[in-house]
UniProtKB/Swiss-Prot annotation:
UniProt name for this protein: Uridine kinase
Keywords: ATP-binding, Cytoplasm, Kinase, Nucleotide-binding, Transferase
Pfam families to which the protein is assigned, alphabetical: PRK
Entries under InterPro entries matching the protein: P-loop_NTPase, PRK/URK, Uridine_kinase, Uridine_kinase-like
Catalytic activity: uridine + ATP = UMP + ADP + H(+); cytidine + ATP = CMP + ADP + H(+)
Organism of derivation: Streptococcus mutans serotype c (strain ATCC 700610 / UA159)
């Protein structure tokens, strides 16, 4: 019977560098069966709303996510069964009709701004990380990403940041730092922290697989 996969939770504010940290872990284990699952894929379907209504979505609130589905999918993967993960369309502000098949792996990195907010999700994790990065750096990264990758205007990004992103960070995201096993200041540039994390993952892999 297949051993239980290692589940690593990686969180932090938008633009903190959590995706880069996740990729650094992935890159360190090229021969392992390892995959990343993004909480963003589980934003709720909003096809029943008008586009104007969808644009006002608060993406930084726990209720924006269908976390129950993510939890169910992780339980299926733990049970060695594949799942179909939804794909979110940021240009239309709703879930795409497409999905992708995720096969069971030895390691899953579950990444997103609120992956430590739900205790049921935390309870499935073996290692929990919080990537802690200065607010100014995070907003600059968010502006670059949303303009280049999501077709957003500068004005809309700044308006959303001041109205939603910053207050939600302090209300919901930053408080989850207390649940982290490791807090990673400076993100992927913190080579000592990345090395410690990779050493721990390797140790668990050697013990259980």
């Amino acid at each position: 019977m297949r051993k239980k996969p290692i589940i690593i939770g990686v969180t932090g504010g938008s633009g903190s560098g959590k995706t880069s940290v996740s990729r650094a872990i992935l890159a360190n284990f090229p021969n392992a069966k390892i995959a990343m699952i993004e909480h963003d894929s589980y934003y709720k379907d909003q096809s029943h709303l008008t586009f104007e209504e969808r644009v006002t979505t608060n993406y930084d609130h726990p209720l924006a996510f269908e976390t129950d589905l993510l939890i169910n999918h992780l339980k299926e993967l733990i049970a060695d069964r594949p799942v179909d993960i939804p794909i979110y369309d940021y240009t239309q502000h709703t879930r795409s009709e497409k999905s992708y098949r995720q096969e069971p792996q030895d390691v899953f990195i579950v990444e997103g701004i609120l992956v430590l907010e739900d205790q049921r999700l935390r309870d499935l994790m073996d290692i929990k990380l919080f990537v802690d990065t200065d607010d100014d750096i995070r907003i600059i990264r968010r502006i670059k990403r949303d303009m280049q990758e999501r077709g957003r205007s500068l004005d809309s990004i700044i308006e959303q940041y001041t109205r939603v992103v910053k207050p939600m960070y302090h209300q919901f995201i930053e408080p989850t730092k207390r649940y982290a096993d490791i807090v990673v200041p400076e993100g992927v540039s913190n080579l000592v922290a990345i090395d410690l994390i990779n050493t721990k993952v390797a140790s668990i892999l050697n013990e259980t697989h």
